[in-house]
Structure formats: C-alpha cells, structure tokens
Amino acid sequence: MSAGIRTYLELMRYGNCLMAGFAAVIGTLIAFNILTSGPLSSNFTGPFPFLDAGFVFLVVFLVSGAGNAINDYFDIKIDSINRPERPIPSGRVQAKEALYFSYLLFAAGTLLAFSINSICGLIALFNSLLLILYAKTLKGTPLLGNLSIGYLTGSVFLFGASVFGLEGLKTLFVLFLLAALAITAREIVKDIEDMEGDRLEDADTLPLRIGAKKAGYLAVLIGLLAVLLSPLPCVMSILGLRYLYLVLLADLGFLAAIVQLLVKNNPTKSSKMFKIAMFFALIAFIAGV
C-alpha cells in the first residue's frame, strides 16, 4: 500500500475507534460485575478476563475502523466537496486501497472475535456485514440508517458482555436496548438539525422525507420509550438502586431534550441534551452494580 500508517489511521478515524474499543471493555466490566457481585450474580467466580478484554478492544477497534474506511470509500463524491482533506479525496489513499484495507480490517477483527468465543464471532461478523450494507445502501435510507446506527453503537456494550457467552449476552441485553433506543432518537434529531445541508446535498433523510415535525414526533416517541423502560434493569434485579437513582438524571436529560425539540424547536440544543443524558446513563450503568 502506498500510503503511510498515519494516513490509514486517519482513514480509520482512530480516535473514534479508541472510544468504541474502551466502551466495549466497559461492557465487559459491567457484565463481570453483575455476574460476580450484582443482584443476579451467577456461578461465575473466575478473575476478570484481561486477555479477552484486550481482544474485545482490538476487535471493536478494527471493525469500527473498517466501517469508517469503507464509509469513506462510498462517500468519495460527497467528501471531495465537503471534506477534500480526507485521505481518499486528497489522493493520499487510492479508493481501491481503502476498500481492500477495510476488508482486511473486517476479516482480522472477525477472526479475532471468533477466537474469544462463537457468540463474539457471530456478533462481529453480523456487524461487519451491516457496516458494509450501511455504507453502501442504508446510510441513504430514511429511518433504517438511523436504526442501524442505534443498533451498531449499542451493540458495542453487548459485544463486550459476550465475553461471558450467552449469560453475558442476556445480562446486558436490556442495557443494550436502552442505549440503542436513545441513540436512534438522537440520530433522528441530528438529521432534523442537518436538514438544510442535507437538502443542498440532495440527501434522503427521514425529516426530508416526512417533514421535521413528524420526524420530531418519532424521535420523541423513541426517546420516551427509552425513559419508560429505563427502570427495567432495577425491576429485573439486573442492577441495584444506585442505578435507579442515577438513571433519573439521565431521564431528566432526555425529557429536557424532548422539550428543546418539541416546545422550543431547537434540534441543535436537543441533540446536545441527548448526548449529555446518554453520558449520565452510562455512569448509571457502571455505578449501578
């Protein structure tokens, strides 16, 4: 390959990959705490699986980087106008090189995931295929693109928990669902925020298809569903009362985001409030064991 390592790291958006990798390890840590000392503690009594957690980090880093690289491959025309400094439109990486590089990362990440266990491998394989489909088709498909991002982001935590097999998967499934709902709602709000730019680029997003008002109602519905379901981890004895107290802060943030969207018609502020609320939700997940 003609480009240097730094250029390929830029193509991967390595900063985002690092954050995704750490988020997956947090999923492993939360599942470990729940399975060993939480209200639903199981027969698992082993030490924290540091090696598998390291593999989890690498898998998510590689697969996330592959998704970003192949996304740039399919966005060559748009990036040549909006982001000409990116590796492909700037000519520092050839388009075919970026495509082959992404396939290499997908393969390496998936194989490494199967070395952890079959559940991790299947999740990595499915997510890799979904990332390819998203970059090629779903990104420009109203709602399906938003749902894909919601699932993919939330599944990072689920993947980390899958180190412990099916038991780990079941343990964090509700948390994954809550995260996916919140992220999907925010993605729709971001599309409302970006309507003017998307219209100029002739993009096909949900707000442009059905209107900002209807898209806003859908985002609110999904966000409210996340709020209504947020006590479930405590009700199901997955997490303790500390989670319930802390998640109330997140719920207040989500409600504030809804007010900003519906009452004040400020999608930019709403998107920021969603982001803050999700941060408090993550703290609640970690501290609630």
From Swiss-Prot:
Keyword flag Transmembrane: yes
Membrane topology note: Multi-pass membrane protein
Function: Prenyltransferase that catalyzes the transfer of the geranylgeranyl moiety of geranylgeranyl diphosphate (GGPP) to the C2 hydroxyl of (S)-3-O-geranylgeranylglyceryl phosphate (GGGP). This reaction is the second ether-bond-formation step in the biosynthesis of archaeal membrane lipids.
Protein name (record): Digeranylgeranylglyceryl phosphate synthase
Pfam families: UbiA
Cell inner membrane found in the keyword field: no
UniProtKB keywords: Cell membrane, Lipid biosynthesis, Lipid metabolism, Magnesium, Membrane, Phospholipid biosynthesis, Phospholipid metabolism, Transferase, Transmembrane, Transmembrane helix
Subcellular localization(s) per the UniProt record: Cell membrane
Classification lineage: Archaea, Methanobacteriati, Methanobacteriota, Stenosarchaea group, Methanomicrobia
GO molecular function: geranylgeranylglycerol-phosphate geranylgeranyltransferase activity; magnesium ion binding
Source superkingdom: Archaea
Pathway named in the protein's UniProt entry: Membrane lipid metabolism; glycerophospholipid metabolism
Family: Belongs to the UbiA prenyltransferase family. DGGGP synthase subfamily.
Main location: membrane
Segments passing through the bilayer: 18-38, 44-64, 106-126, 141-161, 163-183, 218-238, 243-263, 269-289
NCBIfam families reported in the protein's UniProt record: PRK12882.1
Catalytic activities: sn-3-O-(geranylgeranyl)glycerol 1-phosphate + (2E,6E,10E)-geranylgeranyl diphosphate = 2,3-bis-O-(geranylgeranyl)-sn-glycerol 1-phosphate + diphosphate
Biological process, per Gene Ontology: glycerophospholipid biosynthetic process
Enzyme Commission code: 2.5.1.42
GO cellular component, one term: plasma membrane
